[in-house]
Curated annotation (Swiss-Prot):
Protein name: Lysozyme P
Enzyme class, broadest EC rank: hydrolase
Organism field: Drosophila melanogaster (Fruit fly)
Protein family (similarity comment): Belongs to the glycosyl hydrolase 22 family.
GO molecular function terms noted in the UniProt entry: lysozyme activity
Catalytic activity: Hydrolysis of (1->4)-beta-linkages between N-acetylmuramic acid and N-acetyl-D-glucosamine residues in a peptidoglycan and between N-acetyl-D-glucosamine residues in chitodextrins
Length: 141
């Protein structure tokens, strides 16, 4: 049991050292470089703010179905990514959940865009905070 706890602690430490906290403009600029249309950036930055406070290394608490949400966009491990503990996942994005926790947001952006294309903005419970008028991101560029 002690060995298991040590391994878990080391894994979390390794993931945490690769994570970072972004801000609205750094996220908007990186997402733009990754091909996200500029007219969507205010929505994405709002979602990231409300889901993770712009932190890439966040693993949310267990949901009512036992699943967890990962990364800057809090992507669910039952449907979109493969949890490290081997639990069943549909893994629609074809990646490990730990790939959503690093300072490189490429995987998170690709997966989040897939979710948005399939389910729309309401896939995020925080969308209610982002569906109205949002501050412009023009000053970020």
């Amino acid at each position: 049991m002690k060995a298991f706890l040590v391994i878990c602690a080391l894994t979390l430490t390794a993931v945490a050292t690769q994570a970072r906290t972004m801000d609205r403009c750094s996220l908007a600029r990186e997402m733009s470089k990754l091909g996200v249309p500029r007219d969507q950036l205010a929505k994405w930055t709002c979602i990231a703010q409300h889901e993770s406070s712009f932190r890439t290394g966040v693993v949310g608490p267990a949901n009512s179905n036992g699943s967890n949400d990962y990364g800057i966009f809090q992507i669910n491990n039952k449907y979109w990514c493969k949890p490290a503990d081997g639990r069943f996942s549909y893994n629609e994005c074809g990646l490990s959940c730990n790939a959503l926790l690093t300072d490189d947001i490429t995987n998170s952006v690709k997966c989040a865009r897939k979710i948005q294309r399939q389910q729309g903005w309401t896939a995020w419970s925080t969308w209610k905070y982002c569906s109205g008028s949002l501050p412009s991101i023009n000053s970020c560029f």
